Amino acid sequence: MQDVRNINLVNNSSNSHDSSLANSKMPRNFKLLSDPQLVKCGTRLYRYDGLMPGDPSYPTITPRDPRNPLIRIRARAVEPLMLLIPRFVIDSDYVGQPPAVEVTIVNLNDNIDKQFLASMLDKCGTSDEINIYHHPITNKHLGIARIVFDSTKGARQFVEKYNQKSVMGKILDVFCDPFGATLKKSLESLTNSVAGKQLIGPKVTPQWTFQQAALEDTEFIHGYPEKNGEHIKDIYTTQTNHEIPNRSRDRNWNRDKERERDRHFKERSRHSSERSYDRDRGMRENVGTSIRRRRTFYRRRSSDISPEDSRDILIMTRERSRDSDSRPRDYCRSRERESFRDRKRSHEKGRDQPREKREHYYNSSKDREYRGRDRDRSAEIDQRDRGSLKYCSRYSLHEYIETDVRRSSNTISSYYSASSLPIASHGFNSCSFPSIENIKTWSDRRAWTAFQPDFHPVQPPPPPPEEIDNWDEEEHDKNSIVPTHYGCMAKLQPPVPSNVNFATKLQSVTQPNSDPGTVDLDTRIALIFKGKTFGNAPPFLQMDSSDSETDQGKPEVFSDVNSDSNNSENKKRSCEKNNKVLHQPNEASDISSDEELIGKKDKSKLSLICEKEVNDDNMSLSSLSSQEDPIQTKEGAEYKSIMSSYMYSHSNQNPFYYHASGYGHYLSGIPSESASRLFSNGAYVHSEYLKAVASFNFDSFSKPYDYNKGALSDQNDGIRQKVKQVIGYIVEELKQILKRDVNKRMIEITAFKHFETWWDEHTSKARSKPLFEKADSTVNTPLNCIKDTSYNEKNPDINLLINAHREVADFQSYSSIGLRAAMPKLPSFRRIRKHPSPIPTKRNFLERDLSDQEEMVQRSDSDKEDSNVEISDTARSKIKGPVPIQESDSKSHTSGLNSKRKGSASSFFSSSSSSTSSEAEYEAIDCVEKARTSEEDSPRGYGQRNLNQRTTTIRNRNLVGTMDVINVRNLCSGSNEFKKENVTKRTKKNIYSDTDEDNDRTLFPALKEKNISTILSDLEEISKDSCIGLDENGIEPTILRKIPNTPKLNEECRRSLTPVPPPGYNEEEIKKKVDCKQKPSFEYDRIYSDSEEEKEYQERRKRNTEYMAQMEREFLEEQEKRIEKSLDKNLQSPNNIVKNNNSPRNKNDETRKTAISQTRSCFESASKVDTTLVNIISVENDINEFGPHEEGDVLTNGCNKMYTNSKGKTKRTQSPVYSEGGSSQASQASQVALEHCYSLPPHSVSLGDYPSGKVNETKNILKREAENIAIVSQMTRTGPGRPRKDPICIQKKKRDLAPRMSNVKSKMTPNGDEWPDLAHKNVHFVPCDMYKTRDQNEEMVILYTFLTKGIDAEDINFIKMSYLDHLHKEPYAMFLNNTHWVDHCTTDRAFWPPPSKKRRKDDELIRHKTGCARTEGFYKLDVREKAKHKYHYAKANTEDSFNEDRSDEPTALTNHHHNKLISKMQGISREARSNQRRLLTAFGSMGESELLKFNQLKFRKKQLKFAKSAIHDWGLFAMEPIAADEMVIEYVGQMIRPVVADLRETKYEAIGIGSSYLFRIDMETIIDATKCGNLARFINHSCNPNCYAKVITIESEKKIVIYSKQPIGINEEITYDYKFPLEDEKIPCLCGAQGCRGTLN
């Protein structure tokens, strides 16, 4: 157990312990351990503060709080209980004179309520109670109020302030009223005004007793008077003297209450009563007997116990229980009784409403006839049905639903009127027939056969319309009991199967002649201007019948056709209307069918179906108009389409599946396949397994069966009828405007479409005509297929979907997408893209990824079409020979259609393109491979043969030469698709081809020579990108000798960085042979047919190339002359005598031979180029072959040019960059890498320091380098991607250079004995600083710097040393002895470290910590740092303003001109606005609706432009001065909801759109300008902006408009405060304005 804290109980312990504890400190805690009264023990034992006094054997325990810690944790702080003193009520029990705190106000204005009255009391003290009294029956404001103040002072002040004062137009009577005596009298006189006219007995003051209060309470609890007659009679007998006057008074009270209830019933419960009446009447007709019993019960009950009698009982009990007390009523009780009375009144009103509604309808004249007829009919039907076997099964489907058409239309549809689902389409088979029935019972008991499918034998067609009328009259006489809307509508319904065949037959008759798309454009436009149109109107405009315009001035409204079925006048009138409609011809309206344009055939037969179409359109789109439209007499079109859709009986199926229902989608008059035949996208018909889903509901199907809601209410409401008429006129006007606008739009679109077609045809003809003429000069094949393939697609008919709906009389199978899908899509002006060609079947190459340049360079669609035409002509023009015309036409047709988009000229050898391959291509490849096999079998020494043999071989094997071109091209293209060996064996012919598909289309070996010339001419203009160069005459000089196709060589060539020529090739013979060939000129048009910019770029690049080539030639000629002079001097010197290889002459010859071998001319034979490796070592044997006529070309790829001058020194000149045109980008990059390679040792001695004698000893080194020439030269090929663009002639010269030393500098290192010395110097090289000796002038300038710049500590130290030195050397110099040294402070602080800046940092870039940017890399700049250095519009503007060349004219915008311009622009803006308002006022009265649609804000928009901003990316700048408080621009975008805005913001962040262009208008609308908007989206945030955003309302639309806060000058950036809400994740602000907050949020 735990110790208990208690100080007082310590004194109750035993005496023995008291003595021991007296000397010690008083303990705080104790615990009783044992007590002889509780357990068997000797004495009581206590433990104090965890210690047992006198007994140390007990363990020591630390005392703690004995309360449960969990309870302490859970226990809340105890809240203090506020006990309010009860209010002192002044009532009947108050003894003595009450305080004057009760104030009564009489003659209050009716509009004064408690809140207003409380505000009147503010200056008079606090009030305890405020009551404003209303009439207990009418709830009318009585103008009496009672106020109980807290103090008498406040009551006195209120009386003095407001007594006899006018408040809200009435003079108040304010006075103190103890116990409210005057108040009660006034209330009694106002509420019981008849009490003063009593006829019998004196006026008795009412007095309430305890018994009466108890009775009152029981009444209020139950809400109705007690029916216990015995108890009430006992009470009545005691006081009969007062019954008559009280009863007369309460009857008046009840009469007022009845009048008030009638008013509420009429005004507030009209629609609900009609609906409940529908429901009650339906139940009454279904359950006739029980309803009649209930009606008699209600009548008997109402006659037995009327409300008046029950209230008389209540009043008599009240009068009986009153005693003769002096006061009229206890005031407190009266207040409570008033609240109870209100509650009781609401109970009675709620109880009596349904009863009175029923009585109201039962007692109405027109429903008496319904009841009389229904009573007899229901008795007959009940008697008949109870005896039949079908009764049980029929009522098992749905409670109290009968198969009679009259009742099913009125009762069942009223049950489901809230869901607007017709019973035929109810999902759970509530109205389909039972499995026993197959026949639908009609009102005349005639058995009609069910709907028959197409394969059943059908009945003969119906009689003509004249006989239909007679037949209906006969039936009408029989069925006089049938309601009007059934009797009349039956005339339109022949038997169901006949109607099916009749409609099908009429449709088949009219189908061939009903294509309105055949009417030409002029006829359509003329008809439109005459008020007619072509074709059927779109469904969203077919809301009217054909006479909507002619009869719109006199709409005849009748709304009581359904409710009053025995009205013979209505019956005759509607029948006459329907008969008139059947024979009335259709007049052409703006939106009607165009049968008059095609031919007026069978007008009387077609009228029924046409009217059904129009009305089905009306019904299906009735949701677009108001639901409470009056039923206008559209010539009987309202009920003409009434049909009973036959419902198939449900099958006995598995009960766990959905219930099956009949097919409720199609009317019985139209076959089920009509919708699928006429609709392109018909609705999905619910299948057997999905029966619970309701089918489409259209009012044309369900409305005739339903009770006409709103008819009764509109009959007595003239205001509502007028409102509906006005709405009808407005709708008609809007329809006319919509028709006119749509017709106008369709005319414009059709005209533009025809113009666009005409333009495209003529453009294609103009483009293709010169090509065809040039192609006809070489190929005599017809070009008719081009015209076939250019425009073989028919323009889409804009009436296609409209006309698809013309013959559909049911819209039950409406478009599953909805109304928008049924609207015609207006044709757009976008270019129709050609379908991409199918993927070629025979492709053996690997698919390759496009590089960045290839993806960027894409061609337009029009160029692609042109390319299709041209390529097909190109393919055919190549084929000379007996090719059949039909075959070539078909091939060109296929090629024109299927060719893919070709890459532009800039992506020549790296883009992949394809065209359709034919069998001839593969045959040509077979021939090529055979020739190649024989070529590969030739001996290896073929490359070393002489020139004549090779020339003969090339002439004999032209196709092999073509293969050589392709091999070189494969080596030069940087793609990976040529890694396989067989890829290099394929021919290439087309211009942009880089893939295996573009194979040679040569059919005969005789065409090989033609192919070579075609390739050469094709390559001339393109090969600026490529490695295959052309000479200045455009002739291809690089038909190469075939390279041996070994894997090693292929791999080396593939790895090389620059294009490599083969070991030997011949140019001269091929030049001779190709010169006679004529270049096809159509290839150039194909190349440059991309766009105007591409052509301009190509021309500019061509001129640039020619200019650079000219400069290169001049420079090279000058260099060659200088080299020849130096060589001649060396040859003539006496020291150059040839003795042996080590002689000086031999060395000079070696140098000369090296120079010559590097400068071979382009006419050098391929065999000698082949033997370059041997010639470099032993070139002295054949040096006499070249002689002085050889031109020396000292070009190496960006390396040093070396020649020897007359002094025997080898000098080194650096070739200029542009002259190195032959070098590739990769070689230049490798040179940069070599120059900046920090791992190489520094060069101790430059090559220019070596004498010519040492330079000439380089034979062994040259041998080593010559062995590596092949590898070095192969490492200079460009990598994959976009090829280099080198001039043609420079490529030729570069290719003709002998040994390729591209990546290795030409090192002329010594040979023999000096090689170890050079190596020793390189190893032990120590770099040291070398300075030039200064002249005397510089020395003097440095000496006197202490006078010009100042003196530093080092200078002072040196001067002092010099002074002391002079003292020692010249001790007797008088001027030194008289001069004493004084320390001077330093004045030159140039080398001092700069002091640390306190505030602003330098705007320089961050310095690297190690001091070396190359090793550390670059530091990433902050956005703010980058903004200081990057270009933006304001910076360029500032630089321009500080420019010295800036003119000082007034356009330079000085302050004076600036202010002048601002005031001028402000005046112009205001004048424009006033003119605009004047124009709007003038046009508003007379103009069309389109004139008022333009945006008013366009007149007030300022001249703005967007440019690079210093704040963030793009910004908006003013191009004109803007005054303060002027509108700058409207913020335009999509108006979306906040939920959509959150989704879009997440989506934008996911796809990488970091900027936010969402602008909130209010809590429900956000403007999103991310993907569509205007220049306002570029406005940046600023913490000190010059504009502000404002939400204004224009034409009931909210718009965000940016206004200027201050005058804004030209080129000043427009900014405003974004006002982002505060968030944890901060967005840094980059505005840099004064007082910038640092963050946007």
From Swiss-Prot:
Its main location: nucleus. Residues 101-179 form the RRM domain. PANTHER family: HISTONE-LYSINE N-METHYLTRANSFERASE SETD1 (PTHR45814:SF2). The gene is Set1. One of its GO terms (biological process) is methylation. This is Histone-lysine N-methyltransferase SETD1. Residues 291-300 have a biased composition (Basic residues). It is found in: Nucleus; Chromosome. Residues 244-284, 308-341, 349-384, 569-579, 844-867, 930-939, 1119-1128 have a biased composition (Basic and acidic residues). InterPro entries: COMPASS_Set1_N-SET, Nucleotide-bd_a/b_plait_sf, Post-SET_dom, RBD_domain_sf, RRM_dom, Set1-like, SET_dom, SET_dom_sf. It comes from the Eukaryota. Component of the Set1C/COMPASS complex, composed at least of the catalytic subunit Set1, wds/WDR5, Wdr82, Rbbp5, ash2, Cfp1/CXXC1, hcf and Dpy-30L1.
